[in-house]
Amino acid sequence: MTEIMTPAMRQYYEAKQAYPDTLIFFRMGDFYESFGEDAKTIAKELEITLTARGKDRTGERMPLAGIPYHAIDTYLPRLINKGYKVAICEQLEDPKKAKGVVKRGVVRVVTPGTAIDSSMFSDASNNYLMAVAGREGGKSGKNGEKEMEFGISFLDISTGEFLTTQFTDSENFDKLLSELARMHPAECILPPSLYGNSELTGKLREHTIVQEFAPEVFGTEEAGEKLKTHFGVATLEGMGCQKLEFAVYSAWAALEYAKTTQMRDLTHINTLRTYSNTEFMILDSITLRNLEIVKNVRDEGDENSLYRTLNCTRTPMGNRTLKKWLLKPLLSVEKINPRLDAIEELAEDSLLRYDIRDWLSDVRDIERLVGRIVYGNASARDLVALKKSLGVVPSLRDSLLEKARFEMLKEIAEGLASFSELEELAEMIEIAIMDEPPVSVREGGMIKSGYSPELDELRDISSNSKQWIAAFQQKERERSGIKSLKVGYNKVFGYYIEVTHANSSQVPEDYIRKQTMANAERFFTPELKEKESLILTANEKAVALEYEIFAEITRTLSARSRELQETAERIGTLDVLASLAEATENNNYTRPQLTEDCKILIRDGRHPVVESTVSGGFVPNDTEMDCKENQFLLVTGPNMAGKSTYMRQTALIAIMAQVGSFVPASYASVGIIDQVFTRIGAFDDLASGQSTFMVEMVELANILNNASPKSLVLLDEIGRGTSTYDGYSIAKAVVEFLHNRGKVGIRALFATHYHQLTALEEKLKRVKNYHIAVKEDGHELVFLRKIVPGATDRSYGIHVARLAGVPEKVIERANEILKELERENVLEEAEDGENGKKKKSKATARYTQMLLFDPGSGSRSSEKAKGLSPVEAALKKVNPDEMTPIEALNKLHELKKLLG
């Protein structure tokens, strides 16, 4: 029943028909309104009132929800963050001037991955749109499944960053998920062929919002040509993706999706960078979580993360760049050392570092300022922020050109110097834009006086109209000689000159009659008419002219977007180098050595995060690993003693070294690591029905299938989620597998409570035992946090329970049970009379199952350290061939006393 709808409602339904899977924000005067099902959704999600207006197509009352237009920045992010797409349908003309219904149209579609408003994301993170193109290959992978070939691209339209890569080997799926974890896109688009792959979409949805996009975009042979047209190049070879079919498909899909949603040319997206996974250390989602690289495990915030600990950056660009570096440590010593050189110079030259960081404090988010300028969403305040940021560049440039000794800092200085024209842009903004302009660009008050003579005149007319009228009246009295002449105004006739009939003979010839009154005539002159138009419209024209001037300035800035973005990138890099130098000085870090061999040698290593949070000082520890004698470190010791911290700090020091950062140690040499694997902690995956043990085994399988001789593996308490026999068997098999993998095995740190594993040091030549030193003082237990060679024979479980605050009655009962189990172990063991061999009863087997460590009292003898009870130890010392009958009887009484 469209005939009962208003013209505005027809416009709404036309927009909804064009964007059926999108919520519509429909501009109606001072509000954005939504109707029907959209209104119900918006009211629910935004917790606003749902009302009704008019009638829908069926004649029923139409549900309505609306928000004030000026509050869109508050409400829109809430919908986007929940995964909705929102189409903004604006009024395309001034309602006051509209003839009939106001023209309206969708001006942009906001999605999680194409948001440009700063209120929708953090300055510290990129807001990536991810596009995946690919197909199922003909070959089978390791486990018999079909291999997949993938090209993936990441586009941040708020900064202009555009990246692409392609996977062509058998680990495509795992690498795709690793990239997903590292890049953390806000949205991912897939062609129907991949969208229908439930395994792929399921994994993607664990990390991001997944959308299906037009199939023809992902597979078109014209993708390469369209990319070349966009970038204005003749070939994609310079971007490195000319021969990467799926990388090109995914890149064009991402760009086309962004253009479709933004409905404009994305001129600030002016380059595409192709990267390879062989350039960076792989850190999968499990490792990122376990090592807390950028987020902590507790609440997924950045507090107590490595990123937060090292972050002394002063700019948003530096903030984001630091996070990228931490997520992608380098594999090339030649690329790492220039970073270390620059950090060393800035750490040593405290005055230069102080000046740089002081200047950087005035730099705003140039990348996103440029994005808003190009999109036409910038405010005058954004231009002032850009001006202040560009104003810092000469100081940074000149200081570095004068003092920089190492190549990386010199390159930054030369890059900043190559865009000296940017100073002209800052000067243009300084001359044109008020220092403290209003928020809106549509209400005037942002252009300085003196910039535009026309604008100055309009402002003068608007603010001085009364003075001008008075002066005009006096001038006309003198010219005509009519002393009673006056200038008046009414809404019907506008401004007029009024002359009484008595003085009509003195009216000048250029006066034009406008109205005859009973006692007077009203006239106007061309000058008065012109001024009338100016006076009546001066303010309106002034506001319009201001916006026109502002738009012209932004067009000039947009034309220099590439130079501005490259400047922002250099500033971000400099900020990170200065930040890491500051962290070095604040935390007493040292420069690591990077090598191509498999050695890891750390002296006095410290956990960078833990040492910044603990009081009383952090106990440093050494780590020595190589491919000859120390490839596999088996670490034993009680809970809470610091095994996990020690393993994590070793990995974090290696990661920091390959990032190009100084490290918390007195000395560190790291052989390049291609991937860090971790199996630490217990996490149930209840959503998919996986127990702690199942999760552990899945993660372990990933490690064993993918670790290489250049990897570093951290394993903590493997096998604890099942029976002790099963767990021990799995743990031992894992040690043997990693030790024997390839010619030199895989570097690994393995923390365990299975004491029997320490015997592997005698059987496997590259396994070395270490343990955490503990000091006992009566019932007190002191963790010394020091890693020392050799195995421990104690678990101290009951001691740890006491430290944790377990009630003393429970502690006492636990000790009683422990003693009973020890006695049971002796009493249940008997001789097999037929073959003379010992056999264990079921009770003894149960006891052994529970006590792979010997957790007895602190006064055990050296014999007990070998796994013997007091009775067994005493018996071991007895030589029956040398005893008399009476001595044997006395010894039997002694043994009985030992049994209590």
Swiss-Prot record:
CDD domains: ABC_MutS1 (cd03284)
Origin superkingdom: Archaea
Keywords assigned: ATP-binding, DNA damage, DNA repair, DNA-binding, Nucleotide-binding
NCBIfam families according to UniProt: mutS1, PRK05399.1
GO molecular function, one term: ATP-dependent DNA damage sensor activity
Pfam family, one: MutS_I
Gene Ontology biological process terms, A to Z: mismatch repair
Residues where ATP binds: G637, P638, N639, M640, A641, G642, K643, S644
Family statement drawn from the similarity comment of this UniProt entry: Belongs to the DNA mismatch repair MutS family.
Function: This protein is involved in the repair of mismatches in DNA. It is possible that it carries out the mismatch recognition step. This protein has a weak ATPase activity.
Name the UniProt record assigns to this protein: DNA mismatch repair protein MutS
Record SMART domains: MUTSac, MUTSd
